């Protein structure tokens, strides 16, 4: 039996790039392993951090009697926030720390992220953050399930006033301290690059550095970028501080004593129950991106109505499969306030994933004309990310971004010039990347044709309305006014000179966020919100307080931080707060 790739693969390309027999390639919009080429060498299993490779061989499990362990603090989750929290807490207190990670390997979603450290004006991870998303591209269309498909405008930042301002301020300040702490680490200093920024020499860990996965040419996803570098750096500190890491060990319940304070954790590994007596818990267990029950409850439009819109492309989930919202059960088990009203998701698109970075970048440019399979535009392409929600309402939830040759060449030339660094180098090979996509014969990702008629036929786009839409779009480009969706004139590029390109796109998410509500010190509130649970802390995607529920399909996720920033800044702040508690 040959190896197979499981459906939750993130599409990071690492296994395909490292496969010695080139057995891994696209079939449709998913990576698959060719059984005729696979020699079952195990290289893909070795490099996959989320255990997405099914070897077909049953795992041997040795049942054991309940284990009894003891620690001062248990950290739940060995991703970015959890590993930062564990190391900082151990450094501050010298206490015994146990880290629980339910996956086979540490890292979580942060393993695939970027991350920057700097002592200069570029700022560090604690730099002021805003809602994630691309540039303002002008107003969106009507949007929402009632009004039909449209592109939502970027959110008014007044939503920040609804959030916990003291928590936001504390987390940002903690981010500055985290940045300074990392700059002084001996394990970090050899990787800092000295550059000139605004006339000043600064040391930075930049996205120009790829620490492993060197064959990658995709700037949109790790591993090997700053996110995995930070996590690896933290885990290398574990032996120094005596931190115990238990993988394949999922926390199931947080215990409290008669006063309501944390007293322990019940967990399970493949062999049985693990009971840990402790005084404190820091929860950094990730989002609920792979919990379909919670998604259906809070974000039902994440899933298509198969009767109304069959054979849809699923939303691509840029999140570890272990992101299943464990904090909900854990929080309820100990009487914490689970802030369901703030549950939200970040959707963006269209994205070209898991295909080439060149295609991904082309769709980020905003210069394309994007159509559904009926050949019609449906949103303002200049508002990067705003296409995600209206894609919900498009046939099969898939779209194509259309370029002519001068338009595509201009986008790539501009990207090479402005992106710089390693992403600029990736874009220099855009023609090679596109040819490799065409040669893969996946039947969906990219089509190139000499005429628009041929392009429509190849991509499965309804020809007559498509040709009418291109003519209408070109007319608006000449006028310099997008009469349909308000696209900025600078992004209005006519589709006139072949060969023509049709670049596949779909919806994606990097997380569904929310969980237990925390106070300005990352302490978790009790269910009555009249106080906190002594010894319980949370940070990152599973902690509420820095995000607001957008409200309806099509609205943007509203958050005061980027995801990775809230994870590591919050993890650092949690460690500082927990240290105060343990020293009492």
Can you describe what each PLM-predicted range is?
Residues 253-255, 451, 465-550:
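A glycine-rich dinucleotide-binding beta-alpha-beta segment and adjacent secondary-structure elements
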Residues 328-330, 334-458:
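An anion/pyrophosphate-binding glycine-rich loop and adjacent beta-alpha core
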């Amino acid at each position: 039996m040959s190896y197979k790739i499981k459906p939750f693969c993130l599409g990071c390309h690492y296994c395909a790039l490292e496969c010695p027999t080139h057995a891994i390639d696209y079939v449709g919009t998913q990576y698959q392993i060719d059984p005729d080429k696979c020699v079952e060498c195990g290289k893909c299993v070795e490099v996959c951090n989320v255990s997405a490779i099914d070897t077909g061989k049953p795992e041997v499990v040795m049942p054991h009697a309940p284990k009894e362990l003891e620690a001062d603090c248990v950290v739940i989750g060995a991703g970015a926030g959890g590993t930062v929290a564990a190391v900082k807490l151990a450094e501050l207190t010298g206490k015994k720390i146990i880290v629980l990670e339910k996956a086979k390997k540490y890292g979580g979603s942060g393993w695939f992220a970027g991350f920057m450290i700097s002592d200069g004006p570029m700022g560090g991870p604690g730099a002021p953050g805003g809602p994630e998303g691309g540039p303002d591209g002008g107003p969106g269309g009507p949007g929402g399930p009632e009004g039909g498909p449209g592109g939502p405008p970027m959110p008014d930042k007044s939503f920040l006033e609804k959030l916990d301002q003291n928590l936001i301020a504390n987390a940002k300040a903690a981010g500055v301290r985290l940045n300074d702490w990392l700059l002084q680490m001996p394990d970090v200093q050899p990787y800092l690059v000295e550059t000139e920024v605004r006339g000043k020499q600064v040391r930075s860990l930049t996205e120009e550095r790829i620490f492993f996965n060197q064959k990658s040419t995709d700037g949109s996803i790790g591993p090997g970028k700053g996110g995995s570098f930070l996590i690896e750096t933290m885990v290398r500190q574990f032996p120094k501080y005596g931190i115990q890491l238990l993988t394949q060990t999922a926390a199931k319940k947080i215990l409290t004593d008669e006063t309501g304070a944390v007293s322990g954790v019940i967990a399970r590994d493949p062999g049985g129950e693990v009971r840990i007596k402790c005084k404190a818990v820091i929860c950094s267990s990730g989002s609920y991106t792979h919990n379909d029950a919670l998604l259906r409850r809070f974000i039902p439009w994440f899933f298509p109505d198969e009767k109304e819109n069959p054979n849809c492309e699923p939303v691509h989930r840029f999140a570890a499969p272990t992101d299943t919202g464990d904090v909900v059960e854990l929080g309820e088990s100990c009487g914490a306030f689970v802030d369901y009203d703030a549950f939200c998701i970040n959707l963006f698109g269209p994205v070209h994933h898991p295909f080439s970075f060149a295609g991904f970048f082309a769709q980020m440019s905003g210069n394309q004309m994007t159509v559904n399979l009926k050949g019609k535009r449906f949103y303002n392409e200049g508002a990067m990310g705003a296409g995600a929600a209206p894609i919900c309402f498009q046939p099969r939830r898939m779209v194509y971004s259309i370029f002519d040759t001068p338009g595509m060449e201009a986008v790539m030339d501009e990207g090479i010039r402005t992106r710089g660094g390693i992403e600029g180098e990736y874009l220099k090979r855009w023609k090679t990347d596109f040819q490799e996509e065409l040669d893969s014969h996946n039947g969906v990702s990219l089509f190139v044709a000499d005429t628009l008629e041929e392009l429509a036929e190849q991509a499965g786009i309804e020809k007559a309305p498509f040709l009418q839409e291109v003519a209408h779009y070109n007319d608006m480009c000449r006028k310099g006014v997008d009469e349909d969706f308000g696209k900025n004139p600078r992004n209005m590029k006519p589709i006139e000179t072949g060969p023509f390109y049709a670049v596949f796109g779909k919806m994606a998410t990097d997380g569904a966020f929310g969980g237990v509500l925390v106070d300005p010190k990352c302490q978790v509130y009790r269910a009555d919100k009249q106080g906190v649970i002594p010894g319980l802390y949370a940070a990152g995607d599973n902690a509420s307080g820095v995000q607001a529920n957008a409200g309806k399909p099509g609205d943007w996720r509203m958050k005061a931080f980027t995801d990775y920033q809230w994870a590591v800044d919050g993890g650092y702040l949690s460690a500082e707060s927990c240290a105060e508690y343990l020293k009492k």
